[in-house]
């Protein structure tokens, strides 16, 4: 149950999706195991994984409050297969669940493990200040976290998550896949709507006024090199991503939001992400945060029926990244 009685339980909605993923492990090319007391699902480290696994993992990340589909047509003509994300509750789905806001590191051992946790487990632990703004907590008895990682979480991380959620390790499922994998790259591109919501939050737009949202971005081909793989998934969104938000706001606020969301607002816009990353010597904190946004935004005011646009697609930069 959620502590906010007007909001659904993310884990109650995502739970059946997790169990379905586990049940279909063989056909999705996943490896399910028990490690350090928790259930783990390898979706792309030692397992081959699949695009379909990535699509379904993305829906788990959304806490069961969104749909993710692969469409045969998209905004970038030369890369037509597109990840399409829709949520009728994008604030809770994207910020309350999908956003990778929980830093998890092996603080007790020497494994060097580090990953950002996303998914409905965040809403049980509520270790992030964001949940005070959302006014949401999910009092679930089982939960799941998705990790962008090439290995299962060590015991210290499992125990940290168990302590924060108040659940026994056996009641937590960790789903993990590196960016270089089919599933990993797919679930990252499926964050196209989430980064728009994050930008709306960053610029101070009233989140309660965001009613619905749709996003799309080209399905990036995986790459065995981590930097190249990370670059491709980012470029899919930064230069090929498009979102439409439906807001209960007046025209001036809708127009301003459409202008504020896109990646074109960033001083770092204009080069493939791997090139930008190399330019700052691999220091994420030196990259302008405004870059992590979709290329184009459409914001529709349901009050007036008018729509406003900002940003632009850069298909040539998608091509430069993907080839």
Curated annotation (Swiss-Prot):
Catalyzes the hydrolysis of methenyl-H(4)MPT(+) to 5-formyl-H(4)MPT. InterPro entries: METHMP_CycHdrlase. NCBIfam families: one_C_mch. One of its GO terms (cellular component) is cytoplasm. Belongs to the MCH family. GO terms for molecular function: methenyltetrahydromethanopterin cyclohydrolase activity. It holds the Pfam family MCH. It is found in: Cytoplasm. The keyword Cytoplasm applies. One of its GO terms (biological process) is one-carbon metabolic process. It catalyses: 5,10-methenyl-5,6,7,8-tetrahydromethanopterin + H2O = N(5)-formyl-5,6,7,8-tetrahydromethanopterin + H(+). Pathway: One-carbon metabolism; formaldehyde degradation; formate from formaldehyde (H(4)MPT route): step 3/5. It is an enzyme of class 3 (hydrolase). SUPFAM superfamilies: Methenyltetrahydromethanopterin cyclohydrolase. Keywords: Cytoplasm, Hydrolase, One-carbon metabolism. This is Methenyltetrahydromethanopterin cyclohydrolase. Its EC number is 3.5.4.27. It comes from Methylorubrum extorquens (strain DSM 6343 / CIP 106787 / DM4).
């Amino acid at each position: 149950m959620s502590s906010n009685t007007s909001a659904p339980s993310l884990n109650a909605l995502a739970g059946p999706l997790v169990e379905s993923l586990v049940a279909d492990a063989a056909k999705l090319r996943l490896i399910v195991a028990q490690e350090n007391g928790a259930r783990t699902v390898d979706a792309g480290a030692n397992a081959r994984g699949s695009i379909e696994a990535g699509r379904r993992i993305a829906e788990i990340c959304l806490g069961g409050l969104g749909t993710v589909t692969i469409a045969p047509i998209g905004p970038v003509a030369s890369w037509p297969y597109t990840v399409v994300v829709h949520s009728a509750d994008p604030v809770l789905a994207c910020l309350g669940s999908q956003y990778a806001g929980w830093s998890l590191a092996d603080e007790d051992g020497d494994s060097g493990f580090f990953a950002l946790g996303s998914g409905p487990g965040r809403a049980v632990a509520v270790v992030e200040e964001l949940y005070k703004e959302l006014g949401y907590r999910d009092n679930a008895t089982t939960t799941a976290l998705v990790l962008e990682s090439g290995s299962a979480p060590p015991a210290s991380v499992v125990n940290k998550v168990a302590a924060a959620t108040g659940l026994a390790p056996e009641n937590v499922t960790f789903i993990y896949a590196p960016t270089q994998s089919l599933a990993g790259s797919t679930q990252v591109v499926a964050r196209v709507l989430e980064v728009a919501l994050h930008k709306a939050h960053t610029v101070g737009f009233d989140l309660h006024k965001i009613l619905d949202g749709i996003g799309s971005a080209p399905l990036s081909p995986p790459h065995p090199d981590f930097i190249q793989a990370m670059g491709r998934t980012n470029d899919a969104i930064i230069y090929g991503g498009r979102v439409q938000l439906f807001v209960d706001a007046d025209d001036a606020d809708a127009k301003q939001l459409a202008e504020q969301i896109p990646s074109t607002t960033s001083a770092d816009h204009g080069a493939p992400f791997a090139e930008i990353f190399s330019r700052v010597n691999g220091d994420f904190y030196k990259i302008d945060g405004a870059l992590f946004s979709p290329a184009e935004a459409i914001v529709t005011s349901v009050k007036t029926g008018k729509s406003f646009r900002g940003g632009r697609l850069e298909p040539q930069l998608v091509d430069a990244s993907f080839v």
